[in-house]
Structures are given as structure tokens and as C-alpha cells.
Amino acid sequence: IMFLIMGFCNGSCAGFAIPIAQAFGARDYAKMRAYVSNSIRIAVVFAVVITFLSCIFCGKILHLVNTPKEVFDDAYIFLMLQFAAIPFTIGYNLLSGQIRALGNSKQPFYFLITASVINIILDAILILGMGLGVEGAGIATWLSQGISVLLCIWFIKKKMQILIPKGEERKFDNKKISILLNNGVPMGLQFSITAIGLIMLQSANNALGTVYVAAFTASMRIKYLFTCVFENIGVAMATYCGQNLGARKLDRIGQGVRASIRMMLVYFVFTFLLIYPFADEMMMLFVDKGEAEVVTYAAQFMRIANYFYPCLGLLTILRYSI
């Protein structure tokens, strides 16, 4: 469910960055800032509408995927807290996409890593230390994503003031809105369509009982922390290709794709060396040690899923590059 909604938000924001990158590559900075201004308008509307609809239909969505009665209340609370963080998710992806559009892929990555580490630390404190359960997991996500947005805002104001619109560049522009939506919405739908398969998997898994639901939920949280790197490599490629397309340097696009694939494979080796021996220990961050069966199934899922990370990484890179 979260991947369906967040995937649309992330993909859309990545698409919004493409016209910005193309204008930057063509050295048309006024046009670039006009795209920035109008992309912020769209993002605000998306954040309000998606958050509102997600919260309104949260219960119906959980019934649709056969959520067991034993965990329904906890799942509802967790999802509502996740949905409350949608504006932060959109804000981070929009701002980090704008930073990448100017050729800086490192800083958004550092901010993402910082937010992920903070998320893990807060999970440990709120879930294990304070015993807040799913409420703690939701609060941790909310706070960590909020911090990532603040970091992006701080960086743009300090280091990338060229992105800040001024004067006429702040005007509402129907043509630019249309171009932004034509790039953003299809990329968002790509992720949403992929997520339909995950929802079917979640629905089938829910029918197996609470042990499997708990195992799947815990493993997906850790899995996302690892696989979000693939998404960020792909997003970086979207802006990289946009820049070089705008500058008419088409030969650099192929070089970038090959380099990103090599980077993805190196990262896969790192995840394999970390996940295969330590999956059980990682699951214990989210599952009580006494729930041995849940830990076992969650760790098994993590190890099996890890074998297919190269396929996911390759798909993400090529999809964003195209």
C-alpha cells in the first residue's frame, strides 16, 4: 500500500526534475527557475490531495487487502501516521530532485542516508526502548522525513540559490505546468503499476495469518532501506540524462548508464555481504526476540529478495534513464 502511494509521489517528483535539468543543461536559468516555481505549486496540490484521500480511505484499503482482524487496529494506526508524512515525502523528493537537476547527486544521497540512520535510531528508541510499537515506527518515519526536508531547504538556501525563483519567474505558467505533469505523472504511474503486484502479494500474505503478516511487514521496512539506493541512482540518472539531453551531449548518456550499472552491482555485493549473515539481527530491530518464528520468516524473505536486487537495480536505472 505504501509503495503504491509513495511510489507515485517519488516518481512524479523525479519527473518534475527532468525539465529543470534540461533547462539547466541548456543554460536557460530563468526558465529553470520558472519550472522550479511551478513544480512547487503542483507538489503542494499533490501533497494535500493525496494525504487527504489516503487518510479518508485508509480503513477501506486495509479491508481490501485482507488485513487480519488481530492486527487491523495496529495497521490502521501505522498507515495513518505514514500518510501524515506524505507531505514530507513529496517535499524531500521534490527538493532533492531539484538539487540533482543541477548535477549534485551526492548531497541528496547524504541527506537520505542521514534520514535513514535517524529512522533506525528512532525505531530502536521508540519501539524497543519506549515500547510504543507501531506508533513509534510511524513517528520515527514522520520525524526522519521531516529532517530530510529541512536539510534540503538549508542546502538550497546556502549553496544553490540559483534555484530560488524571483520576480516574474514565480508566475503561474499553464504551459510549464503541462510540461511538468507530462513528465511527472507517467513516471509516478510506473511505480504505482509496479506496486499493484506488491498489493496482490500483501493480500495473499495476509491470508496466511498474523505471523506471516508481522514477518512480511518487518522485512519490507528493512528491504526499503536497502532498495531506496537503487531508486536514488535511477533518479540521479533521470536528471543526468535530462541535463545532457538539454546540452545535446548524447554520448555522455550512454557513459552514465554504464557507470550507474557498475555502481549498482558494487552496491549489490555490499548488501549481500550484510544481509546474508546478519538478516536475523536486523529483524530484531523491529521484532521482539521472543517471536522467533517471525524473525526466522522475515530473515528468510530478506535473503531471498536480496538475490534479485540486481534485476531491480537494472530495471530502475533503465526506466529512469529512458
Question: How would you name each of these model-derived features?
Answer:
Residues I20-A85, G129-V185, C241-F308:
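Short alpha-helical transmembrane segments in multi-pass integral membrane proteins
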Residues G103-Y110, V134-G138:
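Short, non-helical or kinked segments that cap or interrupt transmembrane helices
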Residues L81, Y92, A115, S144-S148, ...:
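Transmembrane helical elements of multi-pass membrane transporters/channels
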Residues S96, N119-D123, I127, A140:
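Small-residue (Gly/Pro/Ala) motifs that create kinks and tight helix-helix packing interfaces
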Residues I118-N119, L285:
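Alpha-helical transmembrane segments of compact multi-pass small-molecule transporters, enriched
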Residues I1-F52, T89-P108, A215-A279, G313-I322:
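Small-residue-rich hydrophobic transmembrane alpha-helices
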Residues I1, L62-K69, I125-L132, S192-R221, ...:
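Helix-terminus/linker motif at the lipid-water interface of multi-pass membrane proteins
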